[in-house]
Amino acid sequence: MFTHLTRAFRKMNNLVNRSFIDVHRVVAELSYPEFEEDVKNPESSIYRTPISLFQNKDIVTIVGDYILSPKTDSFQVLYPIKKVIEHFPVIFHCTHNNAPLWVHLLDERHHRLLQSLLTYEIVNAKYRGIVVIPYYRRPINYQTGKSLLMSKLASVKVLDILMRCGSYKFISLMCMINKKNNTNFLHCCASKWGEVGSKMMLHIAEMFFANPTTSQHLSDASSFPDAAAEDDKGKTPAHLAIQEDNADALLFLISLYGAPWFQDNNSYMKSALELKSNKCVKVLSFAADKYEILPNINNNQLEPDTMCGVCATSVEEDENEGKTTSLSWYQMNCKHYIHCECLMGMCAAAGNVQCPMCREDVGDEVLERCPPTIFRWLKLAERSEHNRVLFEAKKQEFYKQMEAMKPPRVVVPPRRTFLTPARRGERAIRIAREIATNAIAEATAQGDVNSYFPVLIDGSGEEYEEEGEEFFNSEEEALAFGRPFLEDEEEARQIQMRQFAELSRRGVSVNIINNDNPHRHISTVNIVQPVYGVEKSPAASFIYNMLKNDVFESIRSRDTRVGGERVPVMNLSNDKRALFHAASSMLCDFATETNSQIVGLDFQAVYDPHHISNYIETFGSPLHAYPGAVTFLDGAQDYYAESIRYDNDIVSFSEMASELHITEALDVFEGSLLSPLFKKIRTGKSYSNWNDHLRRRNYARDIAEEFVRVCENSLASREHPPVHVHPFRDGAIPILIEYIVDFIHHCITWSMQVNALHCMRKYIEHENTNVHLLNLRPTDERVEVLRVSQLRWSRLFNEQYNTRMSLSTKRLSLMKIFNHDLGVSKFGVYKLLDIIEMYCFTLI
């Protein structure tokens, strides 16, 4: 024994610096049990015996911490785990951190490892036949008694894996009952606010429809979950669905699982009417219209001793119990009699609808009233093709009803905004007031009393007037003149003056707009000179403040810690002069170039303002990020499956690791949906998700409207516009705005692709280093994944090149539209587009 331990210690010393997996392989060799019978019991003390070599941890804790570690490689963990299972066959039955060990695999979404263990058969003859993962025998939590299908762990992907691992086990899982409250999984799905959604019932049914060979595991209806089972409070799944007005669940229960909606003198319909569950009332009406079997014989035509072929109750017994009026009868083709309710129950639950007395098949008039239940579908393998055709017709009827229950899809076209002269500055003044309000708080926090904020426009100096406009109410007038809308005009004036007084008290230069005159007076002089010595205009001041507040203040905390040292990612707040020059260039030199007459562009043919683009149309292909970058860091994720999941959910994620420096915070470039597999890791202060902010079409449209407003004002200030130039028509403005929005979204696409290329390149460099250091074989799965990532990088490089070329084409088209067709300076348009592109790229 001493020699054995000495060799083991020597082996561990040689391996401890090489591989964490090999160390645990030694643990398994040191911990092989001596008594076979004890190993078959998960409560045995063998599984809780501490091992001194590993800080007195038992084998369950060691294996649990190992496979659940985020650094565990899912491609290499399977072999040592199988070696442990050969000697500890029920180790995944044992409790680890208050839950069975196999439940943690689901909770952490280690689907690849779970699928391998589900199909693994123990080779050791002593333990052959023991189930490694007892998902269909034991609950996931002994305190709540819930099975896997009753918990939030039952995702669509998990159900697909379980079905592939054996339909018999899956059916056993469906039939599991929570002994705490006497419920099955249908009770959990029927409740709208439960952990499992009602759509899970539909997915399970469709899995059975796609795999009819599971009929060999069904002997009768008792081997299928009971849709009429009552819980400890006497509630059936249909009762719970009606209480929640969950119409989808009720439809699935009746049509797919054979819930008896017709029993107890239509008690379900009465309950739905009392609870005002209007959606469920429609479902019950649909069931009565399509699935109810009407009597074909009057009760007074029956003999007193006529007996039902299903429940064996005679007409005389029905009269004695007072059920003559509530129960109706149906005469079969074989001249036997059955209660209509009994026949409907048989049609819902039975696979072969036959007379129970003589086993003669029922006619088509009965089969056409049978719901397309799962149990009946599985038993159709033994029936004729004619029965299959009737079943498919009823199933299509069910799908049509399901589609009819969906809320109507309403497509709201973009609002057509007409910029009248009196309202042209509405948005700019409103946003400027918000900037002024934020300026007070910022100056107070930083103690800066000399900040320059050109808030509003002066009412004195050289003036020009805009045409007045009739207003129907005070709200319209307040919006047009940029005033806060209050019914009490005096209160509105006091609020505005208090804001100006606070700014003046802080030493901030304040200019006041004359709001009393419906003819607005806009000053072109008396503009406060900036500290940078460059002349400002009101529009340039507004753009400068917008960029300053939205760009610099939001990204100055976006720093990372590399090797313990804080490194700023992008600290542009120290170079405000460059930003001011960029903002000023948006307005300069609009009237210095000559124009030649060129045929105008047909806006309607280029862009459809009523079309709402989807994600791919707006942002390009979703393949611009590499989800497999976290395969080895997060553990137990199938690269190819996660790649498909990414393409469906549009998830963007990147992560880089280094052997010399440990990166504690990495930038995350977001998609429209976040997968729970990927966690954002950031340090410092949190900042807004500017990607999602810019993707909102309303925000992009704000920038586009400001773009058009600046160009339109430049034309209005020209004394002698070119003869060929067409004025801004109200009908063309919304189309121009949408065209610029499209340009903004292409800017975002290109910026995201550039960031993704950078992160992927870092990951590929890191993995190339690991491949050489670990001396991995060319056939190793890690090398194959690296090769795939390099191919994806090449594909993304081509995509970003095409995006950049498309962006250049759109830039030239916009310059042509504004310069040649509308008379705006080409240099000014170029600067406008350049600042928008820089703005989008900075916020990514």
Curated annotation (Swiss-Prot):
Disulphide connectivity of cysteines: none
The keyword Metal-binding belongs to this UniProt entry's keyword annotation: yes
GO terms, biological process: protein ubiquitination; symbiont-mediated perturbation of host ubiquitin-like protein modification
One of the record's GO molecular function terms: ATP binding
Highest taxon listed in the record's lineage: Viruses
Keywords for the protein's UniProt record, in alphabetical order: ATP-binding, Host-virus interaction, Metal-binding, Modulation of host ubiquitin pathway by viral E3 ligase, Modulation of host ubiquitin pathway by virus, Nucleotide-binding, Transferase, Ubl conjugation pathway, Zinc, Zinc-finger
Signal peptide: none
Disruption phenotype: Reduction of host mortality.
SUPFAM superfamilies hit by this protein: RING/U-box
First-level EC class: transferase
Record field: catalytic activity: S-ubiquitinyl-[E2 ubiquitin-conjugating enzyme]-L-cysteine + [acceptor protein]-L-lysine = [E2 ubiquitin-conjugating enzyme]-L-cysteine + N(6)-ubiquitinyl-[acceptor protein]-L-lysine
Listed name of the protein: RING finger containing E3 ubiquitin-protein ligase WSV222
Record pathway: Protein modification; protein ubiquitination
UniProt-listed InterPro entries: Znf_RING, Znf_RING/FYVE/PHD
Function: Probable E3 ubiquitin-protein ligase which accepts ubiquitin from the E2 ubiquitin-conjugating enzyme UBE2E1/UBCH6 in the form of a thioester and then directly transfers the ubiquitin to targeted substrates. Mediates ubiquitination of host tumor-suppressor-like protein (TSL) targeting it for degradation. Might function as an anti-apoptosis protein by counteracting TSL-induced apoptosis.
Assembly information from the UniProt record: Interacts with host UBE2E1/UBCH6; this interaction results in WSV222 auto-ubiquitination. Interacts with host tumor suppressor-like protein.
RING-type zinc finger span: 308-359
Binding-site list for ATP: A229, E230, D231, D232, K233, G234, K235, T236
UniProt EC number: 2.3.2.27
